[in-house]
Amino acid sequence: GIQKKKLVTGATVQVKGDDIQKLNTVSALGALQSQTPGVNITQSSGMPGEGFNVTIRGLGTTGSSGPLYIIDGVTGADINNLNPADIESIDVLKDAASAAIYGSRAANGVVLVTTKQGKAGKASISYDGYFGVQNVYKMVPTLNAQEYAMVQNEGRLMDGLPAYDFSSLVPNWESYANGTNKGTNWLDAMRNENAPIQNHALNITGGSEQSVYSIGISYTSQEGILGKPVQPKYERYTFRLNTEHTILKNNDFDIVKFGENLTYSYSEKSGISIGNQYQNDINGALKANPFLPMYDENGDYHYALPWDVTGENPIALMKYAHGQNLTKKHNIKANVYVTLQPIKNLKIKSSFGLTMDANTYRSFVPVYELASNVYNKENKVTQQMYISSGWLWENTASYDFKINENHNFSAMIGQSIERSGLGDNLSASNVNSIF
């Protein structure tokens, strides 16, 4: 429900949509960072399209610590499918009293998202957009060839092995030894300077005293600052339609109202491997041998050096093993509701919400050989499909009243029926493909 802020006694935080828009972020959760006391928002990866981890008032469980998300009355919806320009406000319920109505699902807090609603009056059209470029403020320093040689020999001596004679192993060793040739900086080679990011949102609102509407259309695009030449990228298209209609009205209040909130989003994401230390392309670039050139004399990716036969080319491995993939996501979130107010301050509301997701993933790994232990003898094609849906039916009745001017009371009773986890998952792969 809705309460005046001065009457709320629970621990809540509200962030207005206008404040979120000003920060020019791809995700609304990114804009909430540093604006919500007691809420810790982190991102485990900076790859475009990656989500956020949210904990409210500290980590209190060994299981999932994420809060319950409710978008326009639909529980479990993904906030990353929303464009920040479509958000009217975000409320974070941090204590048990504020989130009690949601039961055990709200054990880690609740994030309530309200999208922009219609307003009576002439049609109003607004556009919000930005275009920018992204760069790394400071790259992680890596060892150059001279420093790498020194550390390698220190390690061999500690293991009781003879030091490498780099003058006989490395052509033009003198240029490395005197520091004029720094070798290959693999992390810098992955850097995508001036990676573009943009967002465009068009909103239309208007209506009459009986019916109001709000329409939103948006496009978001972001490229990764690391991953060249794979070029990680995230694109999202959204469409939103919110309407509300008054069927019967008294002089002082609306007796019968109904409305709907509909949001559709489509996104595409491609990227590199960002898993653990063994499946992480950036980690591979940090550890790679700077003596290894990126390309050989034929312009192909260079094979491992004879004296370092397991030291693969990290750029080639990133491109061949992890760089040819595409994830597509379709999401529909819909909610219809009716509100009855037979007498003033007695509100009876029934709402039905539906969420549907349809996701696909495709990847291709070609034949390659980069080192004695890093190779793929057969190409591989993988395809996955995931479809899921869920619904929620909620009914509430509330009554507000005052005793004198200083005592405000609100009583509410409600029930909900929810079904989630409906769907199918299909995965298939093949080697030696003919297409």
What residue ranges belong to the model's regions?
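An active-site-proximal structural segment forming one wall of the substrate-binding cleft
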Residues: 346
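Surface-exposed loop/interface segments of Gram-negative outer-membrane beta-barrel transport/assembly proteins
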Residues: 120-183, 227-234, 238, 242-331, ...
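Short, small/polar-rich motifs associated with maturation and membrane association
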Residues: 1-249, 254-258, 333, 427
